[in-house]
């Protein structure tokens, strides 16, 4: 056990944290995860890999923590002495960041600084490698298409602004202290583990529910927003690859293919056997079930962002050339996988 690498994951109960923990355990790591104390259980994504800590074979351990508590983070890093830290924890919902901008900055921006400072204060600069979950939202009002590691940033939300600070403080600690610290600028990545407040999961869950008669209408904001969507399982492998390099760096992970929310909706409903036809314009536009004539998709202005990000498209050339990373799952296959999982869940047949 003592010869195994040790990893610490903040945000372990989220989509990426769950897939990453699974990957690291498969690679032979001892994995420590940080989870927040919550009023409801939020560990369902990792229950299948959790082991009782008294089990002599246990390699996965959970610690209560919070990115807003520096002494807590310092204690966890000191206790675990990780070879690699994956900082995935964040208030990661763009719309919510407009409602909780101060908390978002505290957790996402200063939280990253707290983790870096823990490494520095504990004298782990030459032992611990650091991965920071950056985001394509940094590009915001995109200055060029596609976006790569050299594209100027133009954040358009409190979330993106907080992540911009986190990005640059990682670069600063890398240059100032020689820390092996890397930013993964990940474009949108989804999966059946995606939270239901995110648009892709909202769409697939609604398509499944409507097809089963459990929901009437799916309400969305900007149907023409375009995103570069990939599969989260493939993206967490890219995170791990960054920490295996001799030299740290910043990498875009993306598919290089853009898809509109509208098209994602059509694919999701197609997987349930429904065909969507669009009528009307602007906020009056509706998606109609071609077979029944019923409205199943409608626009709700409340879901429009105060400052919209219309088009994000990533260029992952550097990741392909340096890391050997590639995406494999098409966005259509991803949408279908998510719908099938939601159908199984709603029917009560999910394993």
From Swiss-Prot:
* Listed CDD domains: GDP_MD_SDR_e
Q: Which reaction does it catalyse?
A: GDP-alpha-D-mannose = GDP-4-dehydro-alpha-D-rhamnose + H2O
Tell me which UniProt keywords the record has, alphabetically. Lyase, NADP, Nodulation, Plasmid
Q: Where does NADP(+) bind?
A: 11-16, 66-67, 88-92, 103, 163, 189, 194
> Is NADP among the key words of this record?
yes
Q: Which GO terms describe its biological process?
A: 'de novo' GDP-L-fucose biosynthetic process
Gene Ontology molecular function, alphabetical: GDP-mannose 4,6-dehydratase activity; NADP+ binding
Tell me the active site: 135, 137 (nucleophile), 159 (nucleophile)
Q: Please give the family membership noted in the entry.
A: Belongs to the NAD(P)-dependent epimerase/dehydratase family. GDP-mannose 4,6-dehydratase subfamily.
Name this polypeptide is given: GDP-mannose 4,6-dehydratase
**Species this chain originates from:** Sinorhizobium fredii (strain HH103)
Task: Identify the gene encoding this protein.
Answer: gmd
């Amino acid at each position: 056990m003592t010869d195994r690498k040790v990893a610490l994951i903040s945000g372990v109960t989220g989509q990426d944290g769950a897939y990453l923990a699974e990957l690291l355990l498969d690679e032979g790591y001892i994995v420590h995860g940080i989870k927040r104390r919550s009023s409801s259980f939020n560990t369902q994504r990792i229950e299948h890999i959790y082991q009782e800590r008294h089990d002599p074979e246990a390699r996965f351990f959970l610690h209560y923590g919070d990115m807003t508590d520096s002494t807590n983070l310092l204690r966890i890093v000191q206790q675990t002495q990780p070879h690699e830290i994956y900082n995935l924890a964040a208030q990661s919902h763009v719309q919510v960041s407009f409602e909780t901008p101060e908390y978002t900055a505290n957790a996402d921006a200063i939280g990253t600084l707290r983790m870096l400072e823990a490494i520095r204060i504990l004298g782990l600069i030459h032992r611990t490698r650091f991965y920071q979950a950056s985001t394509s939202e940094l590009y915001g009002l995109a200055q060029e298409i596609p976006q790569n590691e050299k594209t100027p940033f133009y954040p358009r939300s409190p979330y993106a602004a907080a992540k911009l600070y986190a990005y640059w403080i990682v670069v600063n600690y890398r240059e100032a202290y020689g820390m092996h610290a890397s930013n993964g600028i990940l474009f949108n990545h989804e999966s059946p583990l995606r939270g239901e407040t995110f648009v892709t999961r909202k769409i697939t869950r609604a398509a499944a529910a409507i097809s089963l008669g459990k929901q009437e209408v799916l309400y969305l904001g900007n149907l023409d927003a375009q995103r570069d969507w990939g599969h989260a399982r493939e993206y967490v492998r890219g995170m791990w690859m960054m920490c295996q390099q001799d030299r740290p760096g910043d990498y875009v992970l993306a598919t290089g293919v853009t898809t509109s929310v509208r098209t994602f909706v059509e694919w999701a409903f197609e997987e349930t056997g429904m065909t969507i036809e669009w009528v009307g314009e602007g906020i009056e536009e509706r998606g109609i079930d071609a077979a029944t004539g019923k409205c199943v998709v409608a626009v709700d202005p409340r879901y429009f962002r105060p400052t919209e990000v219309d088009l994000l498209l990533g260029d992952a050339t550097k990741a392909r050339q340096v890391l050997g990373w590639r995406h494999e799952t098409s966005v259509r296959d991803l949408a279908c996988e998510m719908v099938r999982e939601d159908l199984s869940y709603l029917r009560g047949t999910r394993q």
